[in-house]
């Protein structure tokens, strides 16, 4: 009986882990961020700051398969946990 119970627990844990979907912050608004579930294959969240002028930055957040490449005057942070790109 104990073996059956242990087997069911292990199977449940494995099945739950296979269905995991990463959630990243998507909205560009600092004050009212929204989130999105990342599609299959996109296992990273990113946040990109782009320098526009002194004290002025544009930023973008979302899901990515790989960390986006920084362009001129960009700062990019990538991470792999839920809503880590706040």
UniProtKB/Swiss-Prot annotation:
Bridged cysteine pairs (disulfide)? 24-45, 38-63, 67-78, 79-84
- Region Finger loop 2, as annotated, extends over 44-63
Which keywords belong to this entry? Disulfide bond, G-protein coupled acetylcholine receptor impairing toxin, G-protein coupled receptor impairing toxin, Neurotoxin, Postsynaptic neurotoxin, Secreted, Signal, Toxin
Q: What is the effect of changing residue 59 to I?
A: Decrease in affinity to CHRM1 and change from irreversible to reversible binding
Question: Which molecular function terms from Gene Ontology are attached?
Answer: receptor antagonist activity; toxin activity
The annotated region (Finger loop 1) lies at 23-37
Task: Indicate where this protein resides in the cell.
Answer: Secreted
**Annotated InterPro entries:** Snake_3FTx (IPR003571), Snake_toxin-like_sf (IPR045860), Snake_toxin_con_site (IPR018354), Toxin_cobra-type (IPR054131)
Q: Look up what happens after changing residue 86 to E.
A: Decrease in affinity to M1 muscarinic acetylcholine receptors
Q: What is its main location?
A: secreted
Please list where the region (Finger loop 3) is annotated: 66-78
Tell me the leader sequence span: 1-21
| Gene Ontology cellular-component terms listed | extracellular region
Describe tissue expression.
Answer: Expressed by the venom gland.
Record has RNA-binding as a keyword: no
Task: Report the domain of life of the source organism.
Answer: Eukaryota
- Domain observations: The finger loop 2 blocks access to the orthosteric site of the muscarinic acetylcholine M1 receptor. Comparison of MT7 alone and MT7 in complex with CHRM1 shows that finger loops 1 and 3 undergo large structural rearrangements upon binding to CHRM1, facilitating extensive interactions with the receptor, while finger loop 2 is mostly unchanged.
Its annotated function is as follows:
Binds specifically and irreversibly to an allosteric site of the muscarinic acetylcholine M1 receptor (CHRM1) at subnanomolar concentrations and shows a very slow dissociation rate. It also inhibits agonist-mediated guanosine 5'-O-(3'-thiotriphosphate) (GTP-g-S) binding and downstream signaling, and decreases the dissociation rate of orthosteric antagonists (N-methylscopolamine (NMS) or pirenzepine). Is a potent negative allosteric modulator (NAM) for CHRM1 activation and a positive allosteric modulator (PAM) for antagonist binding.
Extra info from the record? Answer: Negative results: does not show interaction with adrenergic receptors (ADRA1A, ADRA1B, ADRA1D, ADRA2A, ADRA2B, ADRA2C, ADRB1, ADRB2), dopaminergic receptors (DRD1, DRD2, DRD3, DRD4, DRD5), histaminic receptors (HRH1, HRH3, HRH4) and serotoninergic receptors (HTR1A, HTR2A, HTR2B, HTR2C, HTR5A, HTR6, HTR7). Does not show interaction with muscarinic receptors (CHRM2, CHRM3, CHRM4, CHRM5).
Family of this protein: Belongs to the three-finger toxin family. Short-chain subfamily. Aminergic toxin sub-subfamily.
Q: What is this protein called?
A: Muscarinic toxin 7
> What organism is this sequence from?
Dendroaspis angusticeps
At the highest ranks, the source species' classification is: Eukaryota, Metazoa, Chordata, Craniata, Vertebrata
């Amino acid at each position: 009986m104990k073996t059956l119970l242990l087997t069911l627990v292990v199977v449940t844990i494995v099945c739950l882990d296979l269905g995991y979907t990463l959630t990243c912050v998507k909205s560009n608004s600092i004050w009212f961020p929204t989130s999105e579930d990342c599609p299959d294959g996109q296992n990273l969240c990113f946040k990109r700051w782009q320098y526009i002028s002194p004290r002025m930055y544009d930023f973008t957040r979302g899901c990515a398969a790989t960390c986006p490449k920084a362009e001129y005057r960009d700062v990019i942070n990538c991470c792999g946990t839920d809503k880590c790109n706040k």
